[in-house]
Amino acid sequence: MQKARIRLSGTNPATLDEICNQVRGIAQRTGVHMAGPIPLPTKRLVVPCRKSPDGEGSATWDHWEMRVHKRLIDLDADERALRQLMRIQVPKNVNIEIVLES
């Protein structure tokens, strides 16, 4: 049987967990085997920049960062489950990637 590997990524871990709960609910309603959500390592993007706009004075720096959280879900690829999965309302700041594997 085919499996669907769902990879979620976003900057807000609460919205990722909310979508994972929706996927878990779909798996329970349709009776499909689900593994996960597996939290993957968080990627931390740091951008250092000078506070002073003109370059004069002491070298003081601001450090801006963005954290990208990821989750991985394995789901048996049942047609009913995948149709319901496509109807989930995904926020703009969450990236969802579905790969079918045999």
UniProtKB/Swiss-Prot annotation:
Keywords: Ribonucleoprotein, Ribosomal protein. It comes from Methanothrix thermoacetophila (strain DSM 6194 / JCM 14653 / NBRC 101360 / PT) (Methanosaeta thermophila). NCBIfam families: uS10_euk_arch. This is Small ribosomal subunit protein uS10. One of its GO terms (biological process) is translation. Pfam families: Ribosomal_S10. The lineage of its organism: Archaea, Methanobacteriati, Methanobacteriota, Stenosarchaea group, Methanomicrobia. Part of the 30S ribosomal subunit. Belongs to the universal ribosomal protein uS10 family. One of its GO terms (cellular component) is small ribosomal subunit. Involved in the binding of tRNA to the ribosomes. It comes from the Archaea. One of its GO terms (molecular function) is tRNA binding.
